[in-house]
Amino acid sequence: PDEYEKTVPQVFPTTAPGNFTWLPDIGHYVMTTFYPYQWDLNYANPVVFNEMVNNMLYLVNQGIDIVRIDAVPYIWKQLGTTCRNLPQVHTIVRMMRMITEIVCPGVLLLGEVVMEPEKVVPYFGTLEKPECHMLYNVTTMASTWHTVATKEVALLKQQMDVVNSLPKEYVFLNYLRCHDDIGWGLDYDFLKTSGIQEIPHKKYLNEYFRGMAAGSDARGELYNDDPVLQDARLCGTTASLCGLEASLQAKDPARIERAIQKILMLNAYL
């Protein structure tokens, strides 16, 4: 574990620090990238892959149409690396795609890749060797909320131009919010051309969506605030981030209507 910890970043440094959990009952460490109750699987063992495919096919036989592959970039481990986005991950996903196309061609694989824009698209594979059928449009989601907070559309337009330039076979699942937090994985190279720096901008976005900035009725909450890295994620429903929660508490009809219109606008845009 100590050797892995030298190169593997922590996902939840404040709520679940480290990448391993000691199990005294069996006298072993288990790799737990996310939370102690979420064990990482060793896909280097072919038995693990076979069992996971069996589980997938069992669900498909129950009538499941879309299978989500959770935290795709993390599923292969290699000492001396970040254990993120390794080439073997794409091999595994490609094998799963081949199996579904043969056994259950009507089923879609939905990949969860919550990372920077340039690291998301490779999980579609290529037109010749496809991997995931669909990916969450994480970057557009975060860019949309950036636009809500800043009233600036340049980043969102740039992001949509990137999406629209991809092959039509690449399908994104567009969404405003989900059960996960917002990690502000924006295109900071693009933002730097407008003089916007990553750390101060993340701080502003988190302040805006907690209702701490001028003109904001949002009521989001920080998640996994890391004072060392000066980074934090944000949690909140669409209604809360658009100001409906605060407006209802204030019993202000005008603010309630404004919040509802913002929610309708965002859903219409999607």
Language-model features: where?
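Active-site and adjacent substrate-binding regions of carbohydrate-active enzymes
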Residues: 1-270
